[in-house]
């Protein structure tokens, strides 16, 4: 269960003091600074704001995923994996049900958010304490206008139709010790108990979930041993989870160099309506790469275990109830869904089967859209016979593979903002590390590049960004404008 971060503000100050203070009074100074920031800016800041030209509004909604760019006849679809609605006991500030029924305001926040962020699908991952008590279609919480998705006479999902006609697919699943996504039905009982079935943590449990129609993922890989992952042999593993950044008990496991205390102090500044800070950029303070998870991901692929990676929103709307300067809580469903997502590449109709197949095959990449929407990214291998091999596939070195890549550009560059610095990289898995094998700057990468891998191994593409275009929206937090990942692509495995 996640702890409410507002209650952690004293802890935030203490952690920031412990790790960065130069004097015994640093905690008091930090608290005073934050209080002053929340109350009013100083005169110098006022003058700077007054003198600055008006900035174009930072977009709070996202464009259709197709704007990221079709590749080789496949269309990107924006997918959230690992999200909690009213059938998780800890969602909605711990009140998913009110007076015997679902927390309707919280549910409506969720439904509104999936439309505002132009999602194409959400794979719900509810906790056993509630999902085991209801029929699986109940988890969808369908409302008038929703369309059921039927398979074999059973409801296995639903379409939510947005006001502008866009549709979002909702698919049930669970997160406990294992994370089955895309369940068609409840798993078979264990000892006559559905709760025990949902809490399974062994290969037999993995098999029961697969028989119920799901792909099985391991969530919070930072809390798992590599031996456990090998034994369970899941279909997917998380390589980033925002909860692993903000969870006090796991943040330094997932990201050992991350200063959670300072991050929370910084986030408090986004509450000040006069600060000039754009609240949807609070992610720049909260984010750190989950290096523990990425290390295990490298280990798996270096062993030839081609298990695709996903990013997990782990949205509950229960962690940061503090209202930021836009009048919206810090962890609103909209804000978290806007931060990042998984882009699955689908040829033809987008439906439950095609979404799951793209995830299973690793034909997907993670985009951190908090920094802006990238367009034009592409990564595949081409063998000497001219065949294209997509992310997640295995190719023989004997077939002469060459990587064909194209770096993205910012979809909506806006005057008078500076352009971001972008770099395209290729990494090779070597044990528990991803070692950079090649890189290109943004202009060269955007024109398209080719590179021949020198030896067998697992290779993945990554796009890095220094979001200079966001700098004017972060007065006082310019140090947070730094080199960060924009895209994580799934690997391609080259065998002898």
Map each language-model feature to its residues.
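Bacterial N-terminal signal peptides that target proteins for export
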Residues: 1-9
